[in-house]
Amino acid sequence: MKEKKNACTGCAAAEADGRFVRHPESADGEAVVTAYPVFPGIEIAYCDIHAHECRLEYTPGISLMRISHCREGRLEQQLGNEYYFLAPGDLAVSRSDASDEAARFPTGHYHGITVTIDPAQAPECLSCLLSDVNVRPAALMEKFCANGGYFAARSSASVEHIFSELYSVPEEIRKGYFKVKVLELLLFLSALPTERRRPAYSGAQVRLASAVSEYLLSATEERPTTAELSAKFHASATQILQSFQGVYGMSPAAFLRAQKMHAAAELLRFTDRTVLDIAGQFGYDNASKFARAFRSVIGVSPNAYRSGATADSCAPV
């Protein structure tokens, strides 16, 4: 039977192509961050998370700007008593000293890119790298992070254009391409209006959604209706659905199906059990029905996923 390999927690190992592979500490899963230096004080990192929480690199007294793009899953950001959730396709700009050093992922599954900038180490103005790119990293951080330290924009064609190609960059052009795309991203942000912001959720809404999810996962064979959930948690159906959708990005039923399929994917990655055996564990006695459910969540069939399971990463190969 296959077993997980234990990685050195938090270490960064330099690879031949200049990247660093980090393994942030996580209590309930696996987190891998593949980072590439781009310019002085600027790096691009590919985040592959199969956990609900991990510890970020954090240096007290140093204020960094993080530009995050979510490809899959969901990223939680807490600012005071408000919670924001980054969904697939969304972009967020945050300041490291304005948020907790722990990153949280409600669905336990996240893939995305983070561009980190240290204004104290980065060029004061990017025009020194390319003429007419009159962008100052310190001014960008002031623009997006002055009021609370967080800004988020919903998925758009412009954001997708910038980030989509970064997930499949050929190795032979990678270093130069990263430079071009980071400059494009920062130039785009310099012209982006700041009034766009995803809605915030209260601690009460987050706690309600979390309680519902824990209940669903404790009894996966049951399929409670919204009315039954409403009675159990003493909240209206509207409160439950709005809170759950806000935190997890899907209905309770879709969430439960997704959690089952991601758990099945873990078994496909790390064990030699047959697909039919794994299907039975999650309540499917028909391999075809399981394959359809698996494909609807993961995007490929169980057999195709298993054959390419080592590539469960958003970093370019």
PLM features per residue range, with description:
Residues 1-14:
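Short Lys/Arg-enriched alpha/beta "domain-start" segment
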Residues 249, 283, 294-295, 299-302:
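Conserved phosphate-binding and hydrolysis motifs of nucleotide-dependent enzymes
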Residues 76-78, 83-205, 209, 226-227, ...:
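Alpha-helical bundle regulatory/interaction domains
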Residues 15-111:
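N-terminal functional module of multi-domain proteins
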Residues 239-240, 244, 289-290, 294:
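Short hydrophobic/aromatic patch on the recognition helix
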Residues 210-218, 223-228, 246-288, 307-317:
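Terminal helix-turn-helix DNA-binding modules in bacterial transcription factors
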Residues 66, 177, 251:
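Amphipathic alpha-helical recognition patches that constitute DNA-binding helices
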